[in-house]
A protein has these predicted regions:
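Conserved helicase motor core of SF1/SF2 NTP-dependent helicases
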Residues: 4-9, 14-59, 78-80, 114, ...
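Catalytic phosphate/metal-binding cores of nucleic-acid and nucleotide-processing enzymes, i.e., regions
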Residues: 17-18, 67, 107, 117, ...
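Inter-Walker segment of RecA-like/P-loop motor cores
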Residues: 51-53, 58-59, 65-99
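Conserved RecA-like helicase motor-core motifs
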Residues: 70-75, 274-288
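Mid-core helix/loop region of P-loop NTP-binding domains shared across ATPases and GTPases
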Residues: 94-113
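Nucleic-acid nuclease catalytic cores
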Residues: 356-360, 602-687
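Domain-level recognition of nuclease-like catalytic cores that cleave nucleotide substrates
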Residues: 369-379, 660-712
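Metal-dependent nuclease catalytic cores that hydrolyze phosphodiester bonds in DNA/RNA
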Residues: 384-614
Length: 712
């Protein structure tokens, strides 16, 4: 039996007494340890534990196996739906379909005595409905153990609501399938992850209340205040010093609100470390799930959201200043600590560094902090480095002569972090307007992760998606000495760089091969293309030139055959087609006239949107989006719909013939065609723009409770 703390033992006692228990558990307080102890104590009763994501699911399943626990199943919401209801329900769309059609289980659901709902602060309404349905369909009464940390609720933009935790006893109270109507609320405050100095910093400086306890000594929290230009060098020097002390790259997280934003330090810091041969990883998409193999033995740069549920010995938190509210959290109150920063500052087990930029007159500390710089210097749990300041200049107001606020967007940026309620609304339209062309999907085994000679793993699906079409384009042109598409994109990005920056990339570009003779050459060039576009070095540094060999001749032959069958006729020598074609650019004011006119009645007149969009292939009849991925996602469909809207808004009545818009996934051989009216596209775009730039109405507690009770 696992030895429990007093807090954990108290919770276990309430559960053994048959009560439903709701636990507010701070970061690092040992929720999994508690859950495993509950399973052992209640055996042979059966438990169903719901985890937030697949990574946590596998971690818990591993601990279940090592603890010889046989009376507990561990699932994500999607894996549970796939197992018992619909084999294709890997996404929320599938769960919505199960609820909409009230599908019955395809396999009998076992008799579970206890439902363990972990990370309840991240639950959405459809997950709540789904769990109530599972309980009803199982046909036997259940006991509830609901756990979470209301300050780790990060996914409001996806429809999550911390009230599924804080009001859990009320919203579940009338559920007919409970073994007992009695609920007990408990807390777990003792964190076994963070050190005493970190605990003091979070409680006394960030929150102004005793939210957490800790029980292990440690180094003071290092608070660094420096200019943006110097910050990268300061952090890099600190990381190198940590290596001298015995730390290794896999001990370190570098966290920020954005890993690739204009105002992020992360690009420059990654460049410095990569040039020194330090293995790094930066996710290519900021909402990417982190693959354990890919991040192993590397310094990981990540957003606050992506490291939830993870920990490392050393954590650097960038952007720990008021720029966070200016650029990343415009709608949040500035006098309260955002959950994102609380999560970021509770990931470390040994050393925590927080970094405040001091570059401009308007830069200032986070307003919710309860201590000034001078007060921080007086604390034994803080090591303050930099020039303290007490008086700050208010940010200058916008020039009243130029009242227009312009938002610059790409389709990828537009669809990032859209509220779940908006996505749910849009999904119904997408299901209707995209039509499948051709037969059943046929998945081709194309490696998405490769292993280097140094034993590192690298994500290469982005390189496949660039190289494979370019190989085909050159084949269509009868073979060419160089890939004109890739070279053009690389050269465009190189020309945009300042003369005094990115010498490493410029030197590589100077040595590009004159002839592209193999898939290896194309993959190498694809990696260079990504590097010069993103201005990140790590993947070029970590894949040796001799290792671009994961695409076999048989795979390439099958890809060629598929592209021949789908796009070959439209790309014949007698046809006109354009590769990597920019359909609209943010600087083209004329192209945005109709967009401004259409959006004027839906947004404040001082708000304008400027789009930049580039499509993979434009033929005489079709605008093609080409993918090489395991499945076509909702995001992919949205991108095509956005392209179609931008195309029609740009051309207006000048279009002589309407282009077809299609998406072709080379890996699965799927083709989907867009069959939408301009009204459909307008509806989608308005929903996306309003979801991203207009604050959503929040239900009152009374409305929230009523909606939940009605659903169960």
């Amino acid at each position: 039996m696992i030895e429990l703390s007093a807090e954990q033992a108290n919770i276990l006692l309430h559960i053994k007494n048959g009560k439903n228990v709701v636990v507010d558990s701070c970061a690092g307080t040992g929720k999994t340890t508690l859950i495993l102890s509950v399973a052992q104590a209640l055996s042979p009763k059966k438990l169903l534990q719901m985890t937030y994501n697949s990574m946590l699911r596998y971690e818990v399943k591993d601990r279940v196996k090592k603890s010889n626990i046989e009376n507990m199943q561990v699932h994500t919401f999607h894996s549970l739906a796939v197992r018992y209801y619909l084999p294709t329900s890997f996404t929320d769309t599938g769960i919505r379909y199960i609820l909409l059609k009230d599908l019955q289980p395809i396999v009998a659901i076992p008799k579970f005595d206890v439902f363990v709902l972990d990370e309840a602060q991240d639950m959405t309404f459809i997950y709540f409905q789904f769990m109530a349905k599972v309980a009803r369909d199982a046909g036997s009464p259940i006991q509830l153990l609901i756990l979470g940390d209301y300050m780790q609720g990060l996914y409001e933009f996806k429809g999550a609501d911390i009230r599924f935790l804080t009001l859990a006893d009320i919203i579940w109270s009338e559920f007919a399938g409970l073994t007992s109507p009695e609920f007990q609320k408990c807390t777990m405050k003792m964190s076994y992850r963070i050190t005493n100095p970190m605990c003091s910093f979070v409680n006394q400086v960030m929150l102004g209340k005793d939210r957490m306890d800790a029980c292990k000594p440690g180094e003071p929290v290092t608070y660094i205040r420096n200019t943006r230009q110097n910050m990268e060098r300061v952090v890099a020097a600190e990381i190198l010093k940590l290596f001298e002390e015995g730390y290794v790259p896999s001990d370190i997280f570098v966290l920020g609100p954005s890993v690739k934003g204009v105002n992020s330090n992360i690009r420059q810091l990654e460049n410095i470390l990569s040039e020194r041969g330090i293995p790094c990883h930066v996710p290519m998409l900021e909402n990417d799930k982190i693959d354990e193999r890919v991040i192993d033995r590397k310094v990981v740069f990540s957003t606050f959201h992506c490291v939830k549920g993870r920990e490392r010995k050393v954590v650097f938190v960038l952007g720990f200043d008021n720029s966070y509210f200016r650029f990343n959290a415009r709608t949040l109150p500035r006098d309260l600590c955002p959950n994102t920063l609380y999560v970021a500052c509770t990931r470390s087990t040994e050393r925590l560094y927080v970094l405040e930029n001091d570059s401009h007159r308007g830069d200032r500390p986070l307003e919710f902090l309860t201590m000034s710089h001078i007060e921080m210097k007086q604390q034994d749990f803080i090591r303050f480095r930099g020039q303290h300041q007490n008086l700050f200049v208010e940010p200058e107001e916008r020039d009243k002569g130029s009242p227009i606020i312009k938002h610059f967007l790409t389709p990828t940026e537009l669809i990032k972090f859209i509220p779940e309620c908006i996505m749910e609304e849009i999904s119904l339209t997408l299901d209707r307007i995209f039509i499948t062309d051709g037969g059943e999907p046929d998945d081709l085994e194309i490696p998405s992760i490769m292993e280097t000679s140094n034993g590192f793993f690298e994500e290469v699906s982005d390189l496949n998606g660039i190289a494979i079409p370019c190989i085909y384009y050159d084949y269509l042109q009868g073979g060419s000495q160089n890939s004109n598409v890739l070279l053009r994109l690389i050269q465009e990005n190189i020309e945009e760089m300042r003369s005094n920056e990115h010498h490493y990339l410029k030197e590589i570009v100077k040595t590009l091969p004159e002839n592209l003779e193999s898939a290896s050459d194309y993959l190498f060039l694809a990696n260079i293309s990504v590097a010069v576009q993103e201005k990140l070095y790590f993947k070029l540094k970590q894949i040796d030139r001799s290792e671009y060999n994961w695409l076999t001749e048989s795979v390439l032959a099958e890809c060629k055959a598929r592209m021949d069958a789908v796009i070959g006729k439209e790309c014949s020598p007698s046809s006109s087609y354009h590769i990597e074609d920019t359909i609209i650019h943010s600087g083209d004011e004329k192209a945005h006239c109709r967009i401004d006119e259409f959006l004027r009645e839906h947004f404040d007149p001082t708000t304008q949107f400027r789009f930049t969009a580039r499509v993979d292939l434009v033929t005489d009849s079709t605008v093609w989006e080409l993918k090489c991925t395991s499945k076509i996602s909702m995001d992919h469909l949205l991108q095509v719909a956005i392209y179609a809207w931008l195309w029609q808004m740009r051309e207006g009545e000048l279009v002589n013939e309407v282009k077809k818009f299609r998406i072709f996934n080379i890996r699965t051989n799927e083709v989907l065609s867009l069959n939408a009216t301009l009204e459909d596209l307008n509806t989608i775009m308005l929903a996306l723009l309003k979801g991203k730039f207009q604050k959503q109405d929040v239900k009152t507690d009374e409305e929230f409770i009523a909606e939940c009770k009605e659903a169960i």
